[in-house]
From Swiss-Prot:
It comes from Clostridium beijerinckii (strain ATCC 51743 / NCIMB 8052). One of its GO terms (molecular function) is RNA binding. Pfam families: Hfq. Homohexamer. This is RNA-binding protein Hfq. GO terms for biological process: regulation of DNA-templated transcription; regulation of RNA stability; regulation of translation, ncRNA-mediated. Belongs to the Hfq family.
Length: 81
């Protein structure tokens, strides 16, 4: 039996933003907004490039992420069960 790894929507979203160099606005829970491009991410953090400065942002501090242009998903990238 082959196990199919189900992709996480959050990972797909951030990876598409990173690969396509789409600028995003990160809204933090304290009200601050950060605009930049995703350089990398893991389960707990996002690295954002803001004006040639890298910022390590903890995901628990993020309220919302808004892309400056739509991020497209392939039909088979995310499936709900």
């Amino acid at each position: 039996m082959v196990n199919k790894q189900q992709n996480n929507l959050q990972d797909i979203f951030l990876n598409n933003a990173r690969k396509n160099k789409i600028q995003i606005i990160i809204h933090l829970v304290n009200g601050f907004q950060l605009k930049g491009t995703v350089k990398g991410f893991d389960n707990f953090t996002v690295i954002l490039d803001c004006d040639n400065k890298q910022m390590l942002i903890y995901k628990h501090a993020i309220s919302t992420i808004t892309p400056t242009k739509p991020i497209l998903f392939a039909d088979n990238e995310y499936e709900t069960t």
